[in-house]
């Protein structure tokens, strides 16, 4: 089973801008279909409207306007996977700082592991993968690190 993180946010951003930002920030290669590839990971991202909006995201207190899925190759080395997870975390921080709004990163679609909004970026203190990742752990001293609400669990 592949490792997967889902990111949703309420920022008004079009699909092309979202994909370009992700690709530039993580150093990925965007293919003609919009999928962003990086060794050991690929990302799909799009603005959502109407029936494409995930109503469950409203449990976080805002309406989903875009979504992205980060899928990690299960055949990649642990070092590659950890580096890609760090790139993902840095990209979310950069997006929050540049575009603002609210967002949440879910592990396998239901466990909130990172959130951002008016109060800044917050890492889930219950998610040990953050502190065990040498590239992410330093971020835990720069940003809030506390238990996050888990309305989907």
Where are these regions (language model features)?
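Generic "edge-of-domain/loop-turn" microfeature
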Residues: 12-14, 43, 112
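Short, extreme N-terminal segment that most often corresponds to the first beta-strand
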Residues: 1-37, 148-153
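Conserved short hydrophobic interaction patches
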Residues: 21-25, 91-98
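Well-ordered, non-membrane alpha-helical segments in soluble/globular domains
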Residues: 82-93
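Acidic, proline/glycine-rich low-complexity IDRs
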Residues: 94-153
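Non-membrane alpha-helical secondary structure
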Residues: 10, 14, 84, 128-135
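Residues in well-ordered beta-strands of folded domains
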Residues: 8, 71, 106
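Short, intrinsically disordered low-complexity segments
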Residues: 28-82, 98, 116
């Amino acid at each position: 089973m592949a490792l997967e993180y889902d990111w949703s946010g309420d920022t008004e951003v079009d699909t092309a801008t979202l994909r370009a930002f992700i690709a530039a920030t993580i150093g990925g290669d965007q293919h003609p279909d919009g999928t962003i590839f990086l060794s050991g990971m690929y990302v799909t991202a799009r603005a959502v409207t109407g029936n494409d909006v995930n109503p469950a995201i409203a449990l976080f207190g805002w309406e989903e306007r875009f979504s992205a899925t980060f899928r990690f190759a299960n055949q990649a080395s642990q070092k590659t996977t950890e580096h890609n997870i760090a790139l993902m975390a840095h990209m979310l921080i950069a997006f929050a700082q540049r575009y603002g709004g609210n967002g949440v990163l879910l592990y396998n679609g239901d466990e909130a592991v990172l959130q951002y909004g008016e109060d800044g970026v917050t890492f889930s203190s219950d998610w040990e993968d953050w502190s065990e990742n040498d590239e992410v752990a330093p971020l835990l001293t720069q940003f809030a690190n506390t238990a996050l609400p888990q309305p989907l669990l």
